[in-house]
Amino acid sequence: MHEMSLCEGILQILEEEARRQMFSRVRTVRLEVGELAGVELDAMYFGFDVVCRDTLADGARLEIVQRPGQAFCLGCGERVAVRRRFDACPDCGSYQLQVIGGDELRIKDLEVD
């Protein structure tokens, strides 16, 4: 489950930002997760709760905003929505798609004390 290591990385960022911005508690973490990022959302929620125990983010609420996958089709030259990597272009059927969005995972914002 790579979501656990993702959550550990998020916690590390939270701790660094707490030192830099001088806050002591995290109430809410909002993430943007692309549909093509390969993240299992249920595992992410679980991992976040486990990793954050006894830290500045203990009990923090995790909110995830999922971003749609987007690709550029080399076959027809269109920007298209895709739900999974290696899907065919919904317009022309080509498999020559280059992902241009929806593969990110980033902290959008925090609520802190």
Swiss-Prot record:
GO MF annotation list: nickel cation binding; zinc ion binding
Keywords tagged on the record: Metal-binding, Nickel, Zinc
One GO BP annotation of this record: protein modification process
InterPro entries (UniProt xref): HypA/HybF
Annotated residues for binding of Zn(2+): 73, 76, 89, 92
A Pfam family per the record: HypA
Binding site for Ni(2+): 2
Biological function: Involved in the maturation of [NiFe] hydrogenases. Required for nickel insertion into the metal center of the hydrogenase.
Entry similarity comment: Belongs to the HypA/HybF family.
Name this protein carries in UniProt: Hydrogenase maturation factor HypA
